[in-house]
Amino acid sequence: MFLNCHSHFSFKYGTLSVDKLVAEALRHKIDALALTDINSSAALFPFIRAAQKAGIHPVVGIDFRNGVQQQYIGLARNQEGLYELNKHLSEHLVEKRPFGYKAPSFSHSLIIYPFSEKVFPLEAHEYIGISPSQLSALRSSPWARKKEKLVLLQPVSFSSKLEFNAHRLLRSMDLNTLLSKLPMQEQAAPSEHFYSYAEMIARCEHHSYLLINAQKLLEQCQFSFYFQAIKNKRDLLGSGGEDFDYLRQQTYQGAQNRYPKLSQKVRERIEKELELIEQKGFVSYFLINYDLVNYAQHRNFYHVGRGSGANSVVAYCLGITDVDPMELDLYFERFINLYRENPPDFDIDFSWTDRDEVIAYLFKKYQKRNDAHVALLGSYSTFQYKSVLRELGKVFGLPKMEIESLLHHANQEGYRPDTYGKLILTYAKVLHDMPSHLTIHACGILLSHKSIYYYTATDLPPKGFPVTHIDMHIAEDIGLHKFDVLSQRGLGHIKSTLETIYQNQGIEVNIREVEKFKKDPKVKSLLRNGHTMGAFYVESPAMRMLLAKMKVDTYLELVAASSIIRPGVARSGMMREYILRHRNPECRNQAHPVMAEIMPETYGIMV
């Protein structure tokens, strides 16, 4: 009977977190309910997790509304049903089209229309929802003769009087109006909360069929989902075997360039990594990143591969990263191992002038016509304490001066606010950390094997690329691992600098020749003397002084210097001890033998 529950992902409407929604259902001894957020599919999978853990049968759907005017509710009977609902919602959000009064003819979803006097033909999967407050009107309605098509509809949007008041404040904020001027039709009824079964039976004493029909609808919806399976794009070449063969081929081809004398040690490391990559199901993840940097190189875009992916020899051979893990003895298992639950991490930086074209390439290559397989990863802005205080001050009609005074004194001991100040401080705590609106993750992109609509709806911000309703944490939980495509202005400056050198000197500089730079005597001299102004990451006065003090002229020493200057290392005394042992070899004997064996490059000091 609870076919229309809202979480706080019904932005500026619902007040319940997913966990609190489930906890309230348990408190009222409810064994099945449907989460149907307003024009949002953000919380569906966390709800499934939480409900199943609590022993509650979860049903998922969407409440389709124009503003707050409910048009119909869609419930997914299965995963195909969720696909239908997400696609339908996405099409309307992207095209900014209002929903009609009639839903499409879905094959795997159930539709519930709000009760009205207007009578229209219903398809087999369509029903009319009757709230307890509408029972008296039902008696004289033509719908009363169609009992088999009527279900009890008890919406849930909050759990207490306090949260109902918070809901009204959210509605006022959404409409940018004073609380005293909030129209009744723009807010929920005070009764939109859970009732026990006994209470609902009492409220529908002469209409028990409504409860029975609602229960039958919940039983029709059996949404099974395997969270652990990887949902990313796979079988790029037709099958997993072909993908793996291609990854192996390209890795060894790149190894010929990276390691002109390919040793047995390097071969063993490559084979070990390839085996783990295949076992964990990350072959396509590597191939898509490889495709990405290949396209960038073809377009003469500079990139930098970062993250724990820099520990991979396979990534180094493919050109995704430019750091040699063999030379630096980097630990691949930090990136991928059989027991690591988190997905692998490649952070690929491009120039701010090139990033949008790289993203557009991913959409053009991997998006399918009339369906979505690529989307930018969504994120959520949340209400923060000070911003909520300001918004609530406006809703209560306080002058700007009083709002600023409240902000200034809010956390001061002994502060005694007036009546409105007390209300604002109380409800600021209630609203704090609630999601406010959908935003875009800084760099994440999702590429799914099945349509993205099996997992989420999408919206279309001014950026021009579709954005998911799920965030990074939900995506990882359901097996969709993001690709990180970042923007860095420094790469743009490097490119323009190299163009200037070529114009003025006629010299072409290849910045990917890392080994050449490591051995360049001029580079070593600049580092030794701390002449690094204009060099990213090592140009601060403290860093330049440290480079000169240590006489740094190797890559490992540069890495150590950039580590020991961090506040934690510096405050612990390890920075001072490292410099002492670096400049005075006889002091290195002070290191504990075990520490010296584990960390010989840093003289037994953890940096």
Where are these regions (language model features)?
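Alpha-helical scaffold/interaction cores of sigma-54-like transcription cofactors
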Residues: F2-V607
